[in-house]
From Swiss-Prot:
The keyword Signal does not apply. One of its GO terms (cellular component) is actin cytoskeleton. It is found in: Nucleus; Cytoplasm. SMART domains: ACTIN. This is Actin-related protein 7. PANTHER family: ACTIN (PTHR11937). Pfam families: Actin. The keyword ATP-binding does not apply. It comes from Oryza sativa subsp. japonica.
């Protein structure tokens, strides 16, 4: 039985058999609907409550996570109780040791897996483009991770995490749309879809500031029939990544953060890191973002200009969205056949802490 790879993000869960040249077979929202009794209504009335197991990259509700994985592995992947296989999880930057152990415990004690491995998303994303060294800029739904990787090892002392991401950009977009469409009530799920359809980046800061009244308005009809107009708001979403003050943050833009992160690594690696920069995460697919990032990089004060890695032609489309999963599929083809993973015997002998010795 082929190993399964799972990349559980704050917004989407990606899962599937480890096939490195294909996209994950399952991509679904990382949320569960929980039915709870409404004490106020009485008569045993039940209401639905949406639960998010993963918040800003980390598992926060383990019961919901167990239910979600149960659905994924048995109802979708095709596992059968008593005949579970091997599994590899992707792991976000700065995952606490306790969470790694809890995941291993869940897999061995609840799902009875025959083998377990987890690896950091930054390393896996680079594997997806054939690199073992480079720097990843991962713009996820709930966080931004910047991680230099040298010879397959994340340089944690130089890495950075920001607790902002696609969800914060969605909220910003909603606020801006409300200003120009004050009579329209827009559901946040509609705003999310509008962001994916319309949000983009200006060529540079000067171009952004010049947009103003010259921006061609787009009229969009919402599912409920309301009509909204989208103008400069579509550019504000992307601009916030380069000018964080738009989000109310006193921080430098994303390119500056990349350069300062790499500057904290041993100088001999600077060129290798900056010249193998990889953008990943759903927000990295925003129209114009890659071009704007490279333009800003060309203007940076760094002695070595950051340049973006081009994905191999044989890799699936939307590599930025699925890079960690694809890298996991590549790694699974190595660690499990070569017995580098945590086995059931390892777990029974040592307990959950074995993951720190065998997974890196």
């Amino acid at each position: 039985m082929e190993a399964v790879v799972v990349d559980a993000g704050s917004k989407l869960l990606k899962a599937g058999i480890a096939l490195p040249d294909q996209s994950p077979s399952l991509v679904m929202p990382s949320k569960m609907k929980l039915e709870v009794e409404d004490g106020q209504m009485g008569d045993g009335a039940v209401v639905e409550e949406v639960v998010q197991p993963v918040v800003r990259g980390f598992v926060k509700d383990w019961d919901a996570m167990e239910d979600l994985l149960n659905y994924v592995l048995y109802s979708n992947i095709g596992w059968e109780i008593g005949d579970e296989g091997q599994i590899l999880f992707t792991e976000p930057l700065f995952t606490p040791k306790a969470l790694r152990e809890q995941l291993a415990q869940l897999m061995f004690e609840k799902f009875n897996v025959s083998g377990f491995y987890d690896s950091e998303q930054a390393v896996l994303s680079l594997y997806a483009v054939g690199r073992i060294s480079g720097c990843t800029v991962d713009i996820g739904h709930g966080k931004i991770d910047i991680a230099p990787v040298c010879e397959g090892a994340v340089q944690h002392i130089a890495s950075k995490r920001f607790d902002i991401g696609g969800t914060d950009l969605t909220n910003l977009f909603a606020e801006e749309l409300k200003k120009s469409n004050s009579s329209v009530n827009i559901d946040i799920s509609d705003v999310e879809r509008l962001k994916e359809q319309y949000a983009c980046c200006a060529e540079d800061q000067m171009a952004f500031e010049a947009i103003g009244s010259s921006c061609r308005p787009e009229r969009h009809t919402l599912p409920d029939g309301q009509v909204i107009t989208i103008e400069k708001e579509r550019y504000i979403v992307g601009e916030a990544l380069f000018q964080p003050h738009i989000l109310g943050l006193e921080d430098y833009g994303i390119v500056h953060q990349l350069v300062t992160s790499v500057s904290n690594v041993t100088p001999e690696y600077h060129r290798q890191l900056l010249e193998n920069t990889m953008l990943c995460g759903g927000t990295a697919s925003m129209t114009g973002f890659e071009d704007r990032f490279q333009r800003e990089a060309n203007l940076s004060a760094s002695a070595i200009c950051p340049s973006l890695v081009k994905p191999p032609e044989y890799m699936p489309e939307n590599l930025a969205r699925y890079s960690a999963w694809l890298g996991g599929a590549i790694l699974a083809k190595v660690v499990f056949p070569q017995n580098q993973h945590v086995t059931k015997g390892d777990y029974d002998e040592t307990g959950p802490s074995i993951v720190h010795k065998k997974c890196f």
